[in-house]
């Protein structure tokens, strides 16, 4: 009886959050180890289906996880890096698209349908969703995002399906470009003026002195975040994610959250409880 009462109390407390996010857009960037562990993946997808069921416009943007590396290895395509970015020739760009849009994207759509929901998978090249140009001559087909055309997402959001977006870009010349998935997701969130952008990663969130748990930051604004970056208290691994979030917030994004995707039902705990789960970044 007590467990039932606790469940009822939790649902009652969550009501204000159901109302807050109903008919609002929440963009979720999915990647990292959360894509590898099947139990974690199923937990995340179940959470996404619940969000959709209570009237939230969920947009799922994903990277390639290990799938791109595995396909490149299969075709004996060696990777070279310049300043941390993969040099991408035309063949590598095509293989990356195959892994992203062919394997990972359709697998996620299949899993969502298997769990009782509906999903439509597209890549960034469909409808020129993610428009890009070469970031530099040295990196060949590595793309810099120049524009987001979200109309295809908005049309899907008018249905019962979750839009599942593979983060590839296309140029006005029709060439395919490899784009950073975190940047793509944040730019999509900004273009949609999303209420919330959730970036799933492999850490709990931001720390003032990583990995000291006592220094965990549960909420921070852009001004104080800039101070932490200048003081070099944010790990190098997090800097690209922070830069992507900042850009999206200037574009129209409401809030962003860095969240550990490995925690069971982290999405529900973040969106529907007072305490939250990760680090919230606001204006």
UniProtKB/Swiss-Prot annotation:
Q: Where is this site: Transition state stabilizer?
A: 29, 241
Q: Which CDD domains match?
A: AAK_NAGK-C
EC identifiers of the protein: 2.7.2.8
Report whether Acyltransferase shows up as a keyword of the record: no
Q: Which UniProt keywords apply?
A: Amino-acid biosynthesis, Arginine biosynthesis, ATP-binding, Cytoplasm, Kinase, Nucleotide-binding, Transferase
Catalytic activity reads: N-acetyl-L-glutamate + ATP = N-acetyl-L-glutamyl 5-phosphate + ADP
Q: List GO BP terms, alphabetically.
A: arginine biosynthetic process via ornithine; L-arginine biosynthetic process
Q: In which pathway does it act?
A: Amino-acid biosynthesis; L-arginine biosynthesis; N(2)-acetyl-L-ornithine from L-glutamate: step 2/4
One Gene Ontology cellular component annotation held by this UniProt entry: cytoplasm
Primary location group: cytoplasm
MF GO annotations: acetylglutamate kinase activity; ATP binding
Q: Which InterPro entries does the entry link to?
A: AceGlu_kinase-like_sf, AcgluKinase_fam, ArgB, Asp/Glu/Uridylate_kinase, Glu/AcGlu_kinase, NAGK-C
Question: Is Amino-acid biosynthesis among this UniProt entry's keywords?
Answer: yes
Which family is this protein grouped under? Belongs to the acetylglutamate kinase family. ArgB subfamily.
The free-text function statement in the UniProt record for this protein reads: Catalyzes the ATP-dependent phosphorylation of N-acetyl-L-glutamate.
Entry protein name? Acetylglutamate kinase
